[in-house]
C-alpha cells in the first residue's frame, strides 16, 4: 500500500508527458493521418510472406545439414565400427569420398539430369553446371524456397543414398572400383529415378 501513491504519481506523470504534446500537435494539425487500412494490410501480407519464405528456407537448410551429418560422421563411424581393425580407415574414407564425388557430379550435371525438363526418364541440360539455379524460387518445385536451397537439400539425399550402399560391400571392394561404381550408379540409377 505504501508504494501505491508513488506508482500512481509516476503513471500520471507519464500520461501527462505523452498526452499533452500529442493533444497540442493534434490541435495544430501536425499529426499525420494514418495510412489507409488496405495499405497496412498489404504491407502485413508482404511481411508474412517474407517470414514464411525465410522459415521454409531455414528449415530446409537445417534439414540438409542434419542429413550431411548422418552421412559424414554418422555412416562413416557406423561402418567403421562394423569392419575389422585393418579396414576401419578405408571404410570411413569411402563415406567422405562419396560426399565429395557426388557433390561434384551433382553440380556438373546430376541436378540437371534429375530436375531439368527433359523426357520421361532423364532431365535435359537446363541446369548444366547449375545454370539458372539461383536465389529465386522455382514454382515447379517449391514456391517459397530458393532454387539453391532446394538443390542443396536434394544433393544431401543424392549423397546419402550411395553412402548407404557402401555398407553392403565394406571390406569387399577395391577403392577405385567403388568410385567407378558409385559414379555410374549415381548417373544411371539415382538421377533418372529422382527425375521420374
Label each residue range with its predicted role.
Residues 2-8, 17-196:
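Hydrophobic alpha-helical transmembrane bundles of multi-pass membrane proteins
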Amino acid at each position: 500500500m505504501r508504494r501505491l501513491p508513488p506508482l500512481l504519481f509516476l503513471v500520471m506523470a507519464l500520461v501527462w508527458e505523452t498526452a499533452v504534446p500529442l493533444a497540442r500537435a493534434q490541435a495544430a494539425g501536425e499529426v499525420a493521418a494514418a495510412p489507409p487500412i488496405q495499405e497496412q494490410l498489404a504491407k502485413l501480407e508482404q511481411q508474412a510472406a517474407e517470414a514464411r519464405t525465410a522459415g521454409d528456407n531455414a528449415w530446409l537448410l537445417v534439414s540438409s545439414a542434419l542429413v550431411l551429418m548422418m552421412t559424414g560422421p554418422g555412416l562413416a563411424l557406423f561402418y567403421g565400427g562394423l569392419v575389422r581393425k585393418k579396414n576401419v580407415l578405408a571404410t570411413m574414407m569411402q563415406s567422405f569420398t562419396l560426399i565429395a564425388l557426388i557433390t561434384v557430379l551433382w553440380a556438373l550435371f546430376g541436378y540437371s539430369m534429375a530436375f531439368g525438363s527433359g523426357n520421361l526418364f532423364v532431365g535435359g541440360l537446363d541446369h548444366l553446371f547449375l545454370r539458372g539455379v539461383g536465389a529465386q524460387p522455382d514454382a515447379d518445385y517449391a514456391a517459397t524456397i530458393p532454387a539453391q536451397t532446394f538443390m542443396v537439400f536434394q544433393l544431401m539425399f543424392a549423397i546419402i543414398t550411395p553412402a548407404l550402399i557402401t555398407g553392403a560391400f565394406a571390406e569387399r571392394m577395391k577403392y577405385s572400383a567403388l568410385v567407378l561404381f558409385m559414379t555410374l550408379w549415381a548417373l544411371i540409377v539415382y538421377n533418372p529415378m529422382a527425375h521420374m
